[in-house]
Amino acid sequence: MSRWLLVGLAVLIIAPAARSEDLPPKYRAVVDRGLKWLVKQQHRDGHWEAAGSNFASAMTAMGGTVLLMEGSTIRDGKYSENIRKAADWLMERVQRNGLIGDPNAANQGLGYMYGHGFSILFLSQIYGEEEDGERRRKLEDILTRAVQFCVRAQTSRGGWGYVSAQDGNDFDEGSVSITQVQALRAARNAGIVVPKQGIDKTHEYLKKCTTPRGGLIYSLQSGGGGERPTITVAAIASMFSTGEYTSDLAKRWLKYVQPLVPIESVGRDQFGHSEYTHYYYAQVIYCLGEDGYVKMFPESKESERLTWSRYRNAFFEFLARTQNADGSWNGVPIGQVYTACCYLTILQLDNGVLPIYQR
C-alpha cells in the first residue's frame, strides 16, 4: 500500500470565518448525509478503520475529530456517544511508553506514528471539554506521556518517520513530521507541557527540506525523493496554524504550490492524491480568507489571488455533485472512511467549534 495514502492526514484545519448556518441548504444536506454515513461505519467498540482493516488508530482519531467539528461534544449533541466511544477505544490502547495505539497490531498500516499524532490531536480536544474529574486526570496523564513519547521519537534531523527514530533507524518523512507538529500544538493549546526545542527543531527540518523552487522533499535522511506538492501544502497549513502567515518560507511554499493546484481545475485534477491535496489546500485558502493572499503578496494581480469564497464555491459544488446517495464518496485505495473524513473536514471548516481550529 502506498505511503502516500495517509499524507492527507497530516494537517489540522485552520481558523473559522463563518458559521455553518451560512451554508446554502444544499451543502448542509451534503454534510448531514456524510456524517450519518460515517457514524454507520463506526464499529461497536468505537473504532473506525480504513480499507483492509488498516490504520485503525488514525481513522478513529480522524473520525472523532470530524464529529467534534459538527458541534457535538463528549457530553452533548447528536454524536456525543460516538465521540465518547472513539475516545474510550483510543484511551484503552495507550502503551506504557506513552504511545497511543498497538505497535504490533496488523491494522496499524504503514506505522504507528500517524495514529499517535492524530490521537493526540483528538484527545487534546476531548481533554479541554471533559468535566469528569477522574477522567480528566486520566486524559492529562495520557496526553503528557504521549507528548513525551513523541519528543523521544523525533529523529536527529528534527523530523519524524513512520515509527520512532529508534525503531526506524532515524528515518524521517515529511507528512509524518507535520502530523506530529500539529499534535504537539494541539496538546500545548490544551495546557499540556510541550518542550519548545522539539518544535524549533522541526521548523529547521522543514527549512532544510525546502528546495530552491520552494517545494518540500519527501525525506531529508534519504536525500530527497523529489518535491511533493502535498507535503508542501501541509507545511503551509502547519505554518499558518502557528500564526506565521507572511513568513518568507510560507510565501515560497505557496508560490510553488499555486500553479500546480489551480482552482479552475477543482474536480478535474490530473495528479495523484487529489483528495488529500485539497484537504490541505482548502485549509490554507480558508485561512487566507478574502484578503490574506494580497497581504502576503501586495503586488499580485487580482486574477492571481486565492480567496476562500472562490475556492469554496467550486469545491463544495464538486462535493455535492460526487456524493453517493448513501452519503459516502468513492474512496481512494485507503477507503471511503478516509475520503469521507477528508471531505467532511473541508465542508465543516466554517463551523469554528474547536479552539484548535481558531485563529
Residue ranges of predicted features:
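An alpha-helical repeat/solenoid feature that recognizes helix-turn-helix modules
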Residues: 20-33, 44-82, 95-200, 208-314, ...
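Bacterial N-terminal signal peptides
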Residues: 4-15
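Calcium-coordinating acidic loop motifs
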Residues: 42-43, 324
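Small side chains
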Residues: 8-10, 64, 87
